């Protein structure tokens, strides 16, 4: 139980601005977070509840392609819909924003450059899937296939929604392009990588010290570390996303969504501070020794919040890691 007056960051999953939210989203992340935030405010704690629309995910470009409109058209439609829904549900945000702001890009660039400077990001040439019929490289969500771990036939190129494992597209069995249905080929391309392997020991020790976490969250996270953390590409061959703060890779590259979306919790806190009239106020929730941070997400986002984001925070230095990540299971109807 937090002492009265404790700064508590309530960090809530960022919905893709690619489609309407459903009951599972509300029950899994948004209503629990709002109940928790309201209780903590009544208990006398200083709550900062933040989230926003994720406007750079490939589900957005996939939908835009299908409808024959621009990604910005899709984003504008669903961001407005989300804002209306939160107002009607009376969700008590302190800051609900989007990853499309100049502020978010600036905070993302700051973290990218610090990690690059400290050697936790490096540049590599790798082979990625290319659709010769469409004449383009394929981001993860533009590829489907069979999960190599559980055999699920409709796995995505970034994750299997059946077993929850994150994937690299080249791991898929019988991969296919979602644009043309063709079998993609591997071609060389240059990208920046986050050296997750640098944090194996520190994250393992941190997870061992977590108390009160939900068992499925802790076991899943520890399993990642025990299997050995793999370095992951953090840029993609895309024209929709946060621009790189360096020009090493040339044209046609963007920071990939899984790297920059989690930074939204920090950029939203900074945006709130700027709006409040004290641009440094965010530090109370992110740097204070007594501060707590609780992340409300669905189970499919566990590794991004218990492995990747803590690794980024550790590498950056001076920012608080999550206190708890009470990820919910999927809501099912029978």
Could you say what each language-model-derived stretch is?
Residues 119-191:
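Cys/His-rich short segments
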Residues 105-123:
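Hydrophobic or amphipathic alpha-helical targeting/insertion segments
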Residues 41, 87, 116:
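Anion (oxyanion) recognition and catalysis
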Residues 79-94:
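A glycine-rich helix N-cap at a beta->alpha junction
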Residues 73-77, 93-106, 132-150:
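Aromatic/His-enriched, Gly/Pro-containing loop or helix-boundary segments
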Residues 53-59, 63:
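Short, charge-patterned binding micro-sites
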Residues 2-51, 98, 103-107, 150, ...:
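Structured secondary-structure scaffolds
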Residues 63-76:
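A charged helix-plus-loop insertion that forms the helical arch/lid used to bind
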């Amino acid at each position: 139980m937090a002492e009265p007056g404790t700064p508590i960051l309530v960090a809530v999953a960022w919905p893709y601005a690619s489609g309407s939210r459903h009951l599972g989203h509300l029950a899994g992340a948004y209503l629990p977070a709002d109940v928790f935030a309201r209780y903590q405010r009544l208990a006398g704690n200083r709550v900062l509840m933040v989230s926003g629309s994720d406007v750079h995910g490939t589900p957005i470009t996939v939908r835009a392609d299908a409808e024959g409109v621009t990604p910005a058209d899709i984003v504008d439609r669903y961001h407005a819909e989300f804002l209306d829904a939160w107002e009607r549900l009376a969700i008590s945000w302190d800051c609900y924003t989007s990853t499309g702001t100049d502020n978010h890009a600036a905070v993302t660039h700051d973290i990218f450059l610090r990690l690059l400077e400290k050697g936790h990001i490096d540049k590599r040439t790798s082979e990625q899937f290319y659709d010769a019929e469409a004449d383009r490289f394929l981001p993860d969500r533009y590829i489907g296939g069979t999960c190599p771990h559980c055999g699920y036939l409709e796995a995505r190129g970034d994750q299997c929604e059946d077993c929850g494992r994150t994937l690299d597209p080249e791991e898929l069995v019988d991969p296919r392009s979602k644009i043309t249905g063709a079998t993609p080929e591997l071609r060389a391309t240059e990208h920046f990588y986050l050296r997750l392997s640098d944090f194996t020991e520190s994250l393992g020790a941190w997870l061992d010290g977590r108390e009160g976490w939900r068992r499925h969250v802790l076991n899943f996270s520890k399993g990642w570390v025990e299997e050995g953390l793999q370095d992951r590409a953090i840029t993609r061959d895309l024209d929709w996303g946060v621009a790189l703060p360096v020009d090493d890779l040339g044209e046609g590259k963007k920071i990939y969504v899984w790297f920059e979306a989690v930074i939204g919790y920090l950029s939203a806190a900074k945006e709130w501070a700027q709006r409040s009239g004290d641009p440094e106020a965010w530090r109370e929730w992110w740097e204070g020794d007594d501060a707590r941070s609780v992340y409300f997400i669905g189970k499919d986002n566990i590794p991004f919040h218990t492995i990747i984001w803590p690794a980024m925070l550790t590498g950056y230095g001076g920012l608080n890691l999550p206190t708890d990540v009470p990820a919910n299971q999927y809501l099912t109807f029978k």
